[in-house]
C-alpha cells in the first residue's frame, strides 16, 4: 500500500490537480473497500492536491452514510474533496454487495442517491424513494465547500451523460482499451446531453487511460506485458466467469492470449497512453483538441519493480 502514497506525493510534486481513489470489494488486485479511508490517509500526507472518489458505488451505500463520510473527508482535508459517484463495475461485486441487482440496472441507484446526498448536505431532509426510505435526518458533519464539493459522474452511456448534465455534474469517462473513436463517441454523447438540456451547463470532461512512458524497447515490453497481464486477470470479472481465488482473479497465461486482437501489442500501444514523451504529448494534444479538459493518468499495477517504474513514468510525464 505504501507505493500508492509515494505515487500520490509524486503527483502533487509534479503538478497534478486531482488524485482519485476507487471502490472495489473482495478483490486483492484493487484493494479499495472504502475510497474515503485511503483519501483520508493521502490527505494527511499532502497539502494541495485535490482528493476524488472515482467512484463511490451508489448501490453499496446508504445516503446518510455516504453524505457523512464524504463531508467528513472534505472537512479534514480543508475542502479538497471531489465527489465522484457511479453505478459500479463488476457483476461479481454486485452478487456479493447487493445480491439480485444486475449491473445494467445499477444506474437507478445512482439517480436516487445523489439528490438525497445533496439534500442531506443542505440540512434536514426526509426521503421516501424506491430504494431507500428514512425519516428526517441530515448530514453530520457538512462539507466546507459551498454549496457542496464538485460533483462527478462516471459515464459511458447516453442515460448517464444525460443525468450528469441534468444534475450539474462533471463527467469522467474511461474507454478501457478501445481506440480513439470510443473517446469521440463519449464526447458526442456528452455534447448531445448538453444540447438536450438547454446548453445551460458545461461540465469538466475528464478522460482516463492506462499510461506508461518509456524510451526504449525494454520499457515498451514491460508496459505491454503489464497491461496484458492486467487484462488477462480482469477478463473474468468483466465476463463474470467467477475465477477468483482468495481475492485474486485467475491469470490467463500470456501465451494463451497471443493472437487475440484485444491483447495485440501494437493495438494496445496505439490506443493507450503508451510511448515516448513525444508520442504521448501528441496523443494528449489529440484528446485536448477533442474537448477533453482533464486527463486521468491510470497507472499500470502489474509492472515489474513497481515503485521504480512508476517513478520513472510519472517523472517523465510531469516534465
Write out the residue ranges for each language-model feature.
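Single conserved hydrophobic/aromatic residue that forms the stacking wall/gate
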Residues: 301-319
Amino acid at each position: 500500500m505504501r507505493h500508492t502514497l509515494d505515487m500520490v506525493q509524486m503527483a502533487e510534486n509534479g503538478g497534478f490537480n486531482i488524485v482519485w481513489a476507487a471502490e472495489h470489494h473482495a478483490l486483492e488486485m484493487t484493494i479499495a473497500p472504502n475510497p474515503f479511508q485511503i483519501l483520508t490517509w493521502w490527505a494527511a500526507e499532502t497539502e494541495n492536491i485535490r482528493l476524488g472518489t472515482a467512484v463511490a458505488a451508489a448501490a453499496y451505500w446508504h445516503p446518510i452514510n455516504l453524505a457523512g463520510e464524504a463531508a467528513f473527508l472534505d472537512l479534514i482535508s480543508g475542502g479538497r474533496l471531489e465527489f465522484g459517484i457511479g453505478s459500479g463495475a463488476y457483476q461479481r461485486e454486485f452478487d456479493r454487495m447487493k445480491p439480485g441487482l444486475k449491473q445494467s440496472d445499477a444506474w437507478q441507484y445512482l439517480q436516487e442517491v445523489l439528490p438525497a446526498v445533496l439534500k442531506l448536505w443542505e440540512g434536514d431532509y426526509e426521503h421516501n424513494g424506491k430504494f431507500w426510505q428514512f425519516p428526517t435526518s441530515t448530514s453530520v458533519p457538512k462539507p466546507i465547500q459551498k454549496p457542496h464539493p464538485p460533483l462527478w459522474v462516471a459515464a459511458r452511456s447516453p442515460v448517464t451523460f444525460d443525468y450528469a448534465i441534468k444534475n450539474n455534474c462533471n463527467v469522467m469517462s474511461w474507454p478501457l482499451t478501445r481506440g480513439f473513436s470510443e473517446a469521440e463517441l463519449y464526447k458526442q454523447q456528452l455534447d448531445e446531453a448538453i444540447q438536450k438540456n438547454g446548453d445551460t451547463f458545461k461540465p469538466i470532461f475528464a478522460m482516463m487511460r492506462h499510461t506508461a512512458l518509456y524510451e526504449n524497447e525494454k520499457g515498451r515490453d514491460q508496459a505491454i506485458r503489464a497491461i496484458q497481464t492486467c487484462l488477462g486477470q480482469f477478463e473474468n470479472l468483466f465476463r463474470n466467469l467467477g475465477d477468483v481465488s482468495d481475492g485474486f482473479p485467475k491469470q490467463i497465461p500470456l501465451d494463451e492470449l497471443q493472437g487475440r486482437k484485444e491483447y495485440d501489442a501494437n493495438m494496445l500501444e496505439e490506443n493507450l497512453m503508451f510511448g515516448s514523451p513525444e508520442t504521448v504529448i501528441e496523443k494528449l494534444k489529440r484528446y485536448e483538441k477533442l474537448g477533453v479538459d482533464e486527463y486521468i493518468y491510470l497507472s499500470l499495477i502489474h509492472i515489474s519493480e513497481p515503485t521504480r517504474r512508476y517513478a520513472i513514468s510519472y517523472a517523465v510525464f510531469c516534465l
